[in-house]
Each structure stands twice: as structure tokens, then as C-alpha cells.
């Protein structure tokens, strides 16, 4: 049974927003720092991270149909800081894929007062906190 859970987790399709939900940035009340923390958390989990189009450039939107608005293609209208953050997350996931998907997960610190949580992944001599 426990082996089955590991296998299921390894093939999970992880997402934070979709065509059926409010966009991530909207759910975070346009708090980009919170959205980035959630994206980083998702990229540190087993399974496949899925990015809904526009999340990488800070597209917002309420429930359907506002979550399905057109992609913003004009670079000057995109959040380039968010895009660079996403590129760094993707690069980290590629570089440390084995650690992030096979490493031992340990919850280190939970601070409800400050809405803070910490975890680490360890594999052999590598550790990511």
C-alpha cells in the first residue's frame, strides 16, 4: 500500500490554477510574493508541475470566464520579473530533478503566527531547504 502511494505521488499532475478556477494571482489577492511561494512549493513536490498559460507572466482573473482571458503577448504588458522567476524555477527543477522527486521530504518548521512553513529534501549528500 505505501509503495502504491509513492507511485501515485510520482505521477501526480500538480497545478495551482486552471481554466476552471480563479487564476493563482487573483486567489493570492494580487500578492506576487505569495504566488511565488506557492509556485516554488509546487515545483519542489514530486509529480509534474503544471503552469496554466499566463501564470508565468502574472495574468490574473476571477472565475470563468475571466480566468480564460486572452494571453497577453506584448512583452511590455507582461510581468517580466514573474517570467524570470518562473524560468529560474524551471531551471532549478531540471537541474535538481532527482533530488526534488526522489529526495526524502522532511517538514522542519511551522510558524502559524507568521504564516511560515519550512521543509527540506535530502538525497545522498545533497539537501535543499
Describe the role of every protein-language-model region.
Residues 18-22, 57-59, 78, 106, ...:
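Short, solvent-exposed loop/turn segments at secondary-structure junctions
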Amino acid at each position: 500500500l505505501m509503495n502504491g502511494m509513492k507511485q501515485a505521488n510520482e505521477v501526480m499532475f500538480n497545478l495551482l490554477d486552471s481554466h476552471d478556477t480563479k487564476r493563482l494571482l487573483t486567489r493570492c489577492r494580487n500578492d506576487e510574493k505569495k504566488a511565488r511561494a506557492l509556485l516554488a512549493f509546487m515545483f519542489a513536490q514530486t509529480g509534474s508541475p503544471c503552469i496554466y498559460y499566463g501564470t508565468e507572466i502574472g495574468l490574473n482573473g476571477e472565475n470563468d470566464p475571466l480566468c480564460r482571458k486572452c494571453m497577453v503577448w506584448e512583452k511590455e504588458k507582461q510581468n517580466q520579473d514573474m517570467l524570470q522567476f518562473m524560468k529560474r524555477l524551471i531551471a532549478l527543477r531540471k537541474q535538481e530533478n532527482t533530488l526534488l522527486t526522489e529526495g526524502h521530504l522532511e517538514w522542519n518548521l511551522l510558524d502559524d503566527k507568521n504564516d511560515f512553513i519550512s521543509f527540506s529534501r535530502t538525497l545522498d549528500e545533497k539537501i535543499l531547504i
